[in-house]
Design a protein with these regions (language model features):
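Bacterial Sec-dependent N-terminal signal peptides
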Residues: 1-30, 45, 104-110, 529, ...
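Short, ordered, surface-exposed loop/turn motifs in non-cytosolic proteins
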Residues: 25-27, 34-49, 68
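Short, acidic Ser/Thr/Gly-rich low-complexity loop/linker segments typical of extracellular
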Residues: 51-61
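Structured extracytoplasmic
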Residues: 103-104, 110, 114-286, 292-300, ...
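Exposed, low-structure sequence patches enriched in small/polar residues
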Residues: 257-259, 391-850
Length: 850
């Protein structure tokens, strides 16, 4: 879910694409209801006996191009009479088509424009689909032992509807040259200004046994307003939003969500199907199978499958749209088109794919036009030497060293003819002109700081980043107001050696804190030290405050947005720590980390160390532990979104297994205690097709030795009013002490499954959330200072040990409030009589997702 937010934010920074002008004649117009005069969205518009055509947009308008000087135009939509007329596109006329509502029969199925009585029983369309589903694997390319193909892909983003009126606005008047780069979308017919373009030339390889898929990238080209963002991070976000689509899967992944495929095993319970017409597609007679969800707010599609009228049920062409009322954010219009061809043995081969999207942040805006086009060619089923070489590589995507620096002659020679634009290098020229304007330069700087949190020290290839800026000012009870400044080097300074650090100062305790880190990467990096895969040796020294019982896993403890607390933040001491860490990550998803560490924990007036011997308590200023730690992690098929300071999984579909052990010996390198700590964890996202998904995190751990309380296991308390993963919203810091535990964090996102059925709520497009977090813990007698001498007394009066009852809190929530907010109401279900606790409360977070 964190990555959904990242991917969504960066998507709207990108802005969008133009499609080549390659046809001679334009066919355009609008389709309306003849009675109500309302526009008819998603009507099928095509030229008879051809594959040329489109679907009307949400405003009923259509636009496409053809080289034919004369053709028969056919417009059809469920519940209306078809429109058939001979046209002459050479005249470039605009057609206003009013369709008359009608009743029509499909076998036993009667459809009415106002109130439809749809039945699955004895419906020939449903039976037709069932036979398609039963035979969907018969000619699948994934049943072959091997195949390879050439891929050309172009993804572009553009300012949508960039007409003369918009060009006159004050913002664009400053850049009067923009009119030179305005193009016309061949899909929507709207004027667009392309501001970002990406191209890819690659070879795809597939092997059935052992299962493996590889992509060998020969060329990659990119230019646009998103240049200041991480190239790897942006590519990961775009790949997640515009995933390769397999219509034969049960679920189709798009926009970080999963949508029910019309050929899903549950399709007949999710979709209504109609046999519309018979037409010629590439010389073969095909049935036009239309489909639409029973519930238009659900995560499904409207569309058409053009299926051959033989026993193979071969899909020649697929056209998908989103229902107008779908509970999906920021996507105003989407058109997905796929074309297939047969191999000599009948295997279906994807020949062409395009997805066109109009994004809008709010209603009333023109938003962003985006289009991804992919052409596939040169299929072969005989293994090649190049394929054998690819399968020996550990990474799934193999990128040639010269891929990002290919000359324009390379692209001119390798682009498919249909992909050649009249303004192929327009984005490069546009960016050159924009960068010459100071107002654009400073706007880009501000956006870079807002979206990354860091300030680059130079315009291009910065050697150093200053930040993160959201950690500059914070505060707590021990330090009072706190200021912090820091930064890090990049691969442009040295691709193998990286430095990072910060200096902080508390005005109340008048102490300087800081971090100094030096990392040597055995792999040459492109931008940042933490790029996957990491193979490095790191030296790190840190001196700072220790907020006991608070460990924010996905943000900095100095984040200014965590400053507002529900209780006094006074469980704070000091620590100094020096460590050396060796990290090695593998493309298989396995990684390990070896760390040698020496740490000194220091008491404070808030957290005193009082060593108990009988009835005597002796103050101790500090203690030290020198330890070695081994961490193992396995996350197969994990993909990352890269940022300057961290990286996040693009999705949580991949399971993540972790195992760690820390060992220290008393007297070894100055260690005051023998210490052994083992921890294991697993997390996974489970999709339930149309019913949403569940994120599950399970962890367990144990401290094996007698140690003072700073070395025990303290559950992670969240004292802020924000929603934080893997933390407890109603638990106080240091409320419980354990030396062994088992915890769970389960959140079910229903994606509007219930609200979409409530007339009022479905208009709000809210989505439901149910969560439950809990921890079962135990503190053995040897680590309980009330029962055993030689330990530090618990410094907090209300600290307690757990009985046989686990700590549990549960919540219900609503996300997608104004498209950006999530509100949860949390109840504490156990240990409700403990003093000084909150039994329930409202929590909030920003949550931008599609």
């Amino acid at each position: 879910m964190r990555l959904m937010k990242k991917g969504t934010l960066t998507l709207f920074l990108l802005l969008a694409i133009s499609i080549p002008l390659c046809a001679q004649y334009v066919v355009q117009g609008v389709v309306t209801d003849s009675l109500t005069k309302e526009p008819l969205p998603y009507a099928s518009v095509r030229l008879k006996d051809t594959t040329e055509g489109t679907t009307t947009g949400s405003d009923g308008r259509f636009y496409f191009k053809t080289h034919r000087s004369e053709a028969v135009l056919v417009i059809s939509v469920i519940g209306y009479n078809d429109y058939v007329r001979t046209i002459r596109p050479a005249g470039n006329a605009s057609y206003k088509v009013a369709l008359a509502p009608t009743e029509y029969a499909l076998g036993e199925v009667v459809v009415k424009p106002k109130r439809e009585h749809y039945r699955k029983k004895d419906n020939p369309a449903v039976e037709f689909v069932r036979r398609m589903i039963e035979s969907r694997d018969n000619y699948s390319p994934y049943e072959k032992d091997f195949w390879q193909r050439e891929r050309y892909e172009k993804t572009t983003f553009a300012l949508n509807n960039f007409d003369e009126e918009k060009q006159k606005k004050w913002l664009y008047r400053k850049f009067d040259f923009l009119t030179e780069y305005v193009d016309t979308s061949a899909v929507t017919g709207k004027p667009i200004l392309t501001v970002s373009a990406r191209e890819l030339l690659a070879t795809d390889y597939y092997r059935k046994s052992p299962r493996s898929e590889k992509q060998w990238v020969k060329g990659r080209k990119q230019a646009g307003v998103d240049e200041f963002l991480s190239k790897q991070g942006m590519q990961a976000a775009i790949n997640e939003v515009f995933k390769d689509v397999d219509i034969y899967e049960n679920n189709i992944s798009l926009f970080t969500n999963k949508f029910v495929s019309p050929l899903s095993r549950i399709g007949t319970g999710f979709y209504k199907y109609y046999l519309m017409d018979t037409l010629q597609i590439a010389g073969e007679p095909c049935a036009d199978l239309a489909f639409t969800p029973f519930n238009s707010e659900s995560f499904g599609f409207n569309g058409h499958l053009y299926v051959t009228l033989d026993s193979t049920y071969f899909v020649k062409r697929a056209v998908f749209n989103f229902p107008k009322k779908i509970n999906l954010n920021f996507v105003d219009y989407m058109l997905l088109e796929q074309e297939f061809k047969r191999a000599e043995d009948g295997t279906r081969l994807l020949d062409h794919e395009s997805i066109t999207v109009e994004f809008k942040l709010t209603e009333g805006q023109d938003g962003i036009f985006a289009r991804r086009v992919a052409d596939y060619s040169n299929y072969t089923f005989t293994p090649t030497a190049e394929a054998d070489k690819a399968f020996t590589k550990p990474e799934r995507i193999i990128e040639e060293t010269e891929a990002l620096s290919r000359p324009e002659t390379f692209w001119a020679e390798n682009r498919p003819q249909a992909a050649i634009s009249q303004q192929e290098n327009s984005v490069d020229r546009l960016m050159t002109q924009l960068h010459s304007y100071p107002v654009y330069y400073w706007t880009e700087k501000v956006l870079s700081i807002l979206f990354t949190g860091y300030i680059p020290t130079s315009k291009e290839a910065p050697l150093f980043y200053i930040g993160p800026m959201n950690a500059t000012i914070s505060g707590n009870t021990l330090e009072g107001p706190r200021i912090r400044a820091g930064g890090m080097t990049t691969a442009w300074l040295n691709p193998h050696l990286f430095g990072k650090g910060y200096v902080a100062y508390g005005f109340k305790d008048e102490r300087v804190k800081g971090l100094a880190e030096l990392e040597y990467s055995f792999k040459k990096k492109k931008e940042y030290a933490n790029e996957f895969p990491i193979h490095s040796l790191k030296l790190r020294y840190e001196s700072d405050v220790n907020q006991y019982g608070q460990n924010y896993l996905y943000t900095s403890k100095d984040n200014v947005f965590l400053a507002l607390k529900r209780e006094k933040d006074d469980r704070i001491g000091y620590f100094r720590q020096a460590e050396m860490t060796y990290t090695n990550e593998f493309y298989s998803g396995f990684s390990f980390q070896l760390t040698a560490r020496t740490r000194q924990d220091e008491s404070s007036y808030l957290i005193p160390f009082l060593k108990k011997e009988g009835d005597t308590y002796t103050p101790v200023k500090d203690f030290s532990v020198s330890a070695a730690e081994l961490k193992l992690r396995y996350a197969p098929n994990e993909k990352f979104f890269q940022t300057q300071w961290n990286r996040f999984p693009v999705s949580l579909d991949a399971p993540v297994f972790t195992l760690s052990h820390t060992i220290a010996g008393k007297g070894v390198l100055g260690s005051d205690y023998t210490y052994n700590h083992t921890e294991a964890g697993i997390q996974k996202r489970f999709w339930f097709s149309a019913f949403g998904y569940t994120d599950v995190i399970l962890k367990a751990g144990k401290v094996w030795d007698k140690v003072p309380f700073p070395l025990l296991i303290m559950p992670n308390a969240n004292l802020s009013y924000t929603i934080q993963p893997e933390s407890y919203s109603l638990m106080n810091a240091m409320e419980f002490m354990n030396d062994e535990y088992f915890s769970w964090d389960v959140t079910y996102f229903l994606n509007g499954w219930l609200f979409n059925r409530v007339p009022l709520l479905k208009k709000l497009k809210w989505r439901e959330i149910v969560s439950c977090r809990g921890l079962y813990g135990h503190l053995s007698d040897k680590n309980n200072p009330a029962l055993s001498d030689g330990l530090f007394a618990f410094p907090i009066e209300n600290t307690q040990t757990m009985g046989k009852t686990p700590y549990v809190e549960a919540g219900v929530g609503i996300e997608n409030i104004f498209k950006v907010l999530r509100l949860d109401y949390i109840w504490r279900l156990t240990y409700r009589d403990s003093p000084g606790i909150d039994r329930s409360g409202l929590r909030i977070s920003l949550h931008m997702t599609f």
